[in-house]
UniProtKB/Swiss-Prot annotation:
Subcellular compartments: Mitochondrion inner membrane
Catalytic activity line of the entry: a ubiquinone + NADH + 5 H(+)(in) = a ubiquinol + NAD(+) + 4 H(+)(out)
Its job: Transfer of electrons from NADH to the respiratory chain. The immediate electron acceptor for the enzyme is believed to be ubiquinone.
Keyword field contains NAD: yes
Entry keyword annotation includes Transmembrane: no
Protein name: NADH-ubiquinone oxidoreductase 16 kDa subunit
Membrane topology field: Peripheral membrane protein
GO molecular function: NADH dehydrogenase (ubiquinone) activity
Enzyme Commission numbers on file: 7.1.1.2
Amino acid sequence: XSGKVLSEEEKAAANVYIKKME
């Protein structure tokens, strides 16, 4: 992102990161 809207790729990356933190 550019800081405006999260792309699908960025959403997926964030989802993976969150799952790793659990």
